[in-house]
Amino acid sequence: SSYAEHFEKEFEASLSRFGVKVDFRRQSENYRSGKYAKYVIQAVQKRREIFDILDKFRQQVATPEEREAYYPVSIYCPVCGKDETTITSSSEDGVTCEYTCKCGHKGTWDFSKDFNCKLAWKIDWPMRWMIEGVDFEPGGKDHASPGGSYDTSKIIAKKIFGAQAPMFKGYEFVGIKGTTGK
């Protein structure tokens, strides 16, 4: 059990003491079960469109080489277990790809069978809005800023996944006097 899992379990147990019933959904479990496989494949198929959407919000101009090398998914290496892989090519249908890992491993990945991967944040978030039927999403000012996660993700939701983004409300971070950070 990890440090985070210890506190998750403690928090979950405390909710039941208050009579709160919550449906916890673990995104890592959803990825590893294959629930998101068809959406990962869809994102790989539309990777250039996704790049173009993200590029509209960048300060610097992207090169054609950056666009060609872009993949919206991270693969966890089956040898070292880390997401330090680079996808070097993919099939036309987006189902398979070739990749290399910093550990030296090289391989072929099949997104319809190999599920230990994850979409990049600004693609993962709108995918989950669609799958979970999210109607309202609050978010910190970092997500709410012009060109931030919400602005880019709502375009990706519509153009890549054919889904409507939820209503969004940004909020300020609440701090404790004498501390720094979120």
Predicted region positions:
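N-terminal Rossmann-like or analogous alpha/beta NTP/dinucleotide-binding catalytic cores
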Residues: 1-51, 61, 153
